[in-house]
């Protein structure tokens, strides 16, 4: 599942590899997947995407945006894997969506458990979790302070576990079950411990673990349980890039 470190990694890779490429053909699923969700009919995606140029990509919480010409946005998330192939590479047999570009390279979207591949012709995305991701302060940002985290804890039901506090309802956009396991391990906090019984020191330790774990994961290109644009999670940071350059 795409979580914040992979979202940031993937959006950077799309910017580096795909910006300026124009979509020439759209191929729909060769193996329909009942838990792949689309915005409207995927059979109409060709009309919406062919001729559009990828301008940029942005990552918000659990969402990766492909910003296209003519104000079109393609938006993916959850269990969607995206792989970029060079011209002449063998086309995989199974996929949920395939885009070809003007240089004969192509982009393949597949879904494991569940995921969404949406296209919005007017850039308007009516999704409460997307709005939350856009409007919230990223935990990677210096603006996400301990005061922000304390507010989150104060507003949570005290019967919530530490794991549920971090991993459910997108309270912190882009933080799910995957990264939460590492955050709690690094904080040395039992996932089942109730928020009510977290001491002030534990809250401080948990906040620091949240920030440091996400920054480290993102800097290293995401978790090694996920794949990136090239089917591997490699360290994509530039030689001069530091952890402070992530957002």
Please place each PLM-identified region on the residue numbering.
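Acidic, proline/glycine-enriched N-terminal capping motif
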Residues: 1-131
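Catalytic cores of large soluble enzymes that bind and process phosphate-bearing ligands
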Residues: 2, 6, 141, 202
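Basic, nucleic-acid-binding surfaces and adjacent catalytic neighborhoods in DNA/RNA-processing proteins
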Residues: 22-44, 58, 150-243, 247
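Short histidine-centered catalytic/ligand-binding loop motif
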Residues: 88, 131-142, 193-200
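Short, amphipathic alpha-helical segments
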Residues: 89-93, 143, 156, 173
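A short, charged helix-loop
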Residues: 118-155
């Amino acid at each position: 599942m795409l979580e914040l470190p992979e979202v940031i990694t993937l959006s950077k890779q799309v910017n580096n590899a795909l910006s300026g490429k124009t979509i020439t053909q759209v191929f729909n699923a060769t193996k329909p997947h009942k838990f792949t969700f689309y915005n409207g009919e995927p059979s109409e995606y060709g009309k919406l995407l062919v001729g559009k140029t990828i301008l940029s990509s942005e990552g918000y919480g659990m969402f990766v945006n492909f910003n296209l010409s003519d104000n079109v946005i393609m938006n993916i998330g959850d269990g969607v894997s995206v792989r970029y192939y060079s011209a002449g590479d063998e086309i995989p047999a199974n996929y949920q969506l395939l885009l070809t570009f003007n240089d004969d390279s192509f982009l393949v979207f597949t879904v494991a458990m569940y995921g969404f591949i949406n296209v919005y012709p007017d850039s308007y995305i009516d999704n409460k979790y997307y709005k939350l991701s856009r409007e919230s302060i990223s935990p990677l940002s210096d603006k996400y302070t301990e005061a922000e985290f304390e507010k989150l804890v104060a507003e949570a039901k005290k019967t919530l576990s530490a794991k549920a506090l971090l991993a459910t309802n997108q309270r912190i956009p882009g933080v799910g079950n995957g990264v939460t396991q590492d955050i709690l391990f690094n904080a040395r906090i039992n996932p089942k411990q109730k928020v009510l019984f977290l001491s002030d020191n534990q809250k401080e330790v948990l906040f620091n673990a949240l920030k440091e774990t996400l920054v480290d994961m993102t800097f290293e290109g995401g978790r090694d349980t996920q794949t990136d644009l090239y089917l591997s999670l490699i360290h994509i940071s530039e030689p001069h890039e530091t952890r402070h350059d992530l957002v």
